[in-house]
């Protein structure tokens, strides 16, 4: 039996108003990128249920690593949302995402799964976006970004960043930790950023 691990996006949920959500949360994609991922998830799920393969879908939040931090954005002085307008985000270190994908493949090959299983490939962080930028700035001795109200920020950031600023959710990773245990490199983004700063990005 063939096995497939598909890396989707947590963007398939759209805006959840900062709520903590599980894998059973209804999908409400709000941009073309997320719509494409929903279409791909559904197409793969149909094929898996027809018996073509066993499938794990990993819904992935913001990926970061030693070489994937918002340092250029901080140097450019790109603003973040004011605290009262800020959005909740989730994160995963690239090395931990790779470990999760490998754990998923191993479990699929043991045939202990239903034909389709979904996981939030997220660490334990519960952090707002602006606080994440502040965290990185502090770790690397940089100036924190200015904070602007939601109505002011649209003209100052890219459309891609603005789309992230319009969605707020917290991913519950209970199922992941119970069924796909890994040796974490960074259980939360604060630990991962501190390690990156210690090594020098």
Which positions does each model-derived feature cover?
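NAD(P)-cofactor binding segment of oxidoreductase domains
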Residues: 1-7
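Catalytic helix-loop patch of NAD(P)-dependent Rossmann-fold dehydrogenases
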Residues: 17-57, 82
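Substrate-positioning beta->alpha
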Residues: 63-73, 82-106
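Conserved C-terminal active-site "lid" loop/helix of NAD(P)H-dependent oxidoreductases
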Residues: 154-183
